[in-house]
Amino acid sequence: MKKLLIALISASLFQHASAKDAKIELTGNDQMQYNIKAFEVTEGQKVVLSFKHIGQLPAVAMGHNVVILAAGTGVPAFATKCAPAKANGYIPLDEESKKQMIAHTKLLGGSESDVITFTAPAAGDYPFICTFPGHFAIMQGVMTVKAK
């Protein structure tokens, strides 16, 4: 009984240590720049992404979001599909687009913030962009997912 209890406690501690969340803090500003262009997580890891628009301008003039795309998604083609989706914060709702997105924040104006949580997908490189019209050309980066 004592050995079983020790084994269960050890397994619980190991599981807790290996399940550590990845905490990512991204900002976007009125100069259309993210503070970081790349970050790294491990497949299967819980990712908590905090995004803050540190500029002053409102969302209608200089809105920013973070959209993490599936590996292999063509960024310019995806961004083009976002432009007409103003009513949804420039997030397209068609099924193909939904399959191309891993996660996304809300569209934010100056001083606003959002937090999203998702599970890191399989190992690979996943682009992230701002889908406000025209921003993707400058506001983009890569989430690298490492194998376990």
Show the residue positions of the predicted features.
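Short Gly/aromatic-enriched secondary-structure transition segments
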Residues: A61-L69
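Extracytoplasmic/periplasmic copper-protein system
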Residues: K20-T27, L69-P92, T119, A123-D125, ...
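Sec/Tat signal peptide C-region and signal peptidase I cleavage site
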Residues: L13-A19
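Short beta-strand and strand-turn-strand segments in soluble, beta-rich domains
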Residues: Y90-I102
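Sec-dependent N-terminal signal peptides
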Residues: L4-L13
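N-terminal edge beta-strand
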Residues: D21-V47
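Extracellular/periplasmic metallocenter environments
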Residues: K52, K99, A103-K148
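Extended, low-complexity, turn-rich repeat/linker tracts enriched in Gly/Pro/Ser/Thr and Asp/Glu
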Residues: G55-A59
